[in-house]
Design a protein with these regions (language model features):
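Hydrophobic anchor at the beta1->P-loop junction of P-loop NTPases
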Residues: 7
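Conserved glycine(s) of the Walker
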Residues: 14
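Conserved substrate/cofactor phosphate-moiety recognition/catalytic segment
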Residues: 23-64
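Glycine-rich phosphate-binding loop used to anchor ATP phosphates in small-molecule kinases
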Residues: 58-109, 124
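A glycine- and Lys/Arg-enriched "phosphate-lid" helix/loop adjacent to the NTP-binding pocket
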Residues: 96-162
Length: 181
């Protein structure tokens, strides 16, 4: 059984907070590639930033997500990803037209259920690592919500509830699914 679970969706929708909750409960988590890249680039004066060179940023995110995916395969329990390979490949393909999405998705499959955080304007904020506005975040969300089913994933939209309840929702969903197999 594939235990690499992808949590994607709208920027500012509560993904990172949710992953922190899952980590606090003892689950393996993988931090969003984009945030790690932005931090590295800002510290080192690099240009692979989404507001400087989005294609270079997406390519770096793809490389990092592939490495993250390979590392997670060693885990025995659930591993939760804050975004991942598909998000980065979808961004690169949207920007450049380069047909990378299907090939990368086929080679690196996550759990068949993808959990998406919907737009949640009440909690959306910008910060030094997240500079785009909520309209861009919603456009990105709509694109991802359309992409995942075309790649054979079942999309589960997370409810707008407290972070502990969201974590319970995901864990209960996965537990029920595991019992049914």
């Amino acid at each position: 059984m594939n235990r690499s679970v992808l949590i994607s969706g709208c920027t500012g929708g509560g993904k990172s907070t949710l992953l922190a909750e899952l980590a606090a409960r003892g689950h393996a988590v993988v931090e969003e590639p984009g945030r790690r890249i932005v931090k590295q680039e800002l510290e080192g004066g690099g240009a692979a930033l989404p507001w400087v060179d989005m294609a270079a940023f997406a390519r770096r995110a793809i490389e990092m997500a592939i490495a993250d995916y390979a590392s997670a395969r060693e885990q025995t329990g659930w591993t939760f990803f804050d975004r991942g390979l598909i998000d980065a490949a979808a961004a690169l393909q949207h920007l450049t037209g380069e047909p990378v999405l299907e090939k990368l998705s086929a080679a690196h499959r996550y759990h068949p259920r993808i959990f998406l955080t919907p737009p949640w304007p009440e909690i959306y904020t910008t910060d030094p690592e997240r500079r785009h506005g909520s309209d861009e975040a919603v456009t990105e969300y709509d694109r991802l919500a359309a992409v995942y089913p075309t790649l054979g994933y079942d999309v589960v939209i997370l409810p707008k509830i407290a972070v502990a309840d969201r974590a319970d929702f995901i864990l209960d969903f996965l537990s029920r699914e595991t019992r049914q197999q």
